[in-house]
Amino acid sequence: MNLEKVKSIQLLKLVLTGFYLVFVAFWIQSCTINPATGKKSISLNTMAEEEKIGRSEHPKILRAFGGEYQNLRLKNYIRTIGNKLANVSELPSINWKFTILNSKEVNAFAVPGGYIYVTRGLIALANNEAELAAVLAHEIGHITALHPSSRRATGTLTGIGVLASGIIFGRAGSEIGDLIGRYSMSRYSKSQEFEADLLGVRYLSRANYEPK
């Protein structure tokens, strides 16, 4: 390897390291106190941008789960419960959307922008309205705690880290960074699930459901 090429690689490493450090500083500055949790939360997007992300993901989710379950009475029922809970959350003014997915799978989840999904398979297992409300309240808790947003922010930061580690430390560094990135974005942490539980109980109580 000639001297000029070595210098070019060293310069590239310095540039990427500097970019990575600037991004980390920006990431830290993006931390704000979340009114729902009272803790610092990370979000690189405004609420309008969050809603745009959710709107973009919505058709993909519908395709992946067999579309929206077309039972108008049940749709209105779930929407009524969801809005009742969302209205007593720390984010009552965002445009919450509650969708029943036409899937036998037992699942419920949330994406940025106030998009909450519950499958007909899960609804079929619920014994009463309070149990459905508990599921929806938990997912609302993920949104108000900004868990989907912080996961995306962490994923963005990790992606930069994978790029930097690959160039600075070679293939091994890239593989390690990629492994960390996949793990960090694969699921909510136990602490996030517990936090969503606590917030869910708060919203159930405010909406006059008896948490169980």
Give residue spans per PLM region.
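A Zn2+-metalloprotease active-site environment signal
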Residues: N2-Y20, F26-K212
